[in-house]
Amino acid sequence: MAGKPVERPFSDILTSIRYWVIHSITIPALFIAGWLFVSTGLAYDVFGSPRPNEYFTEDRQDAPLVTDRFNALEQVKKLSQ
């Protein structure tokens, strides 16, 4: 054995070409993927949150709040109609 493994100093990592080659691709790719996820509306579908134009309907102009925790399912069904 050559000895104990030692962590590489962070300054060495930041100044390496390999780090910047990898991260110059992955960081913008993550940013673009997140922007597309939100701008296409897929985030609303995945997490089930209403779109901004679905919070208020013509019939219901007050905030859709669940106030009774024991009948919450019935309230949610009534609010989603």
Swiss-Prot record:
This is Cytochrome b559 subunit alpha. Belongs to the PsbE/PsbF family. The lineage of its organism: Eukaryota, Viridiplantae, Chlorophyta, core chlorophytes, Chlorophyceae. It is a single-pass membrane protein. InterPro entries: PSII_cyt_b559_asu, PSII_cyt_b559_asu_sf, PSII_cyt_b559_CS, PSII_cyt_b559_N, PSII_cytb559_asu_lum. It is found in: Plastid, Chloroplast thylakoid membrane. Signal peptide: none annotated. Its cofactor is heme b. It comes from Tetradesmus obliquus. Keywords: Chloroplast, Electron transport, Heme, Iron, Membrane, Metal-binding, Photosynthesis, Photosystem II, Plastid, Thylakoid, Transmembrane, Transmembrane helix, Transport. With its partner (PsbF) binds heme. PSII binds additional chlorophylls, carotenoids and specific lipids. GO terms for biological process: photosynthetic electron transport chain. GO terms for molecular function: electron transfer activity; heme binding; iron ion binding. The chain crosses the membrane at residues 21-35. This b-type cytochrome is tightly associated with the reaction center of photosystem II (PSII). PSII is a light-driven water:plastoquinone oxidoreductase that uses light energy to abstract electrons from H(2)O, generating O(2) and a proton gradient subsequently used for ATP formation. It consists of a core antenna complex that captures photons, and an electron transfer chain that converts photonic excitation into a charge separation.
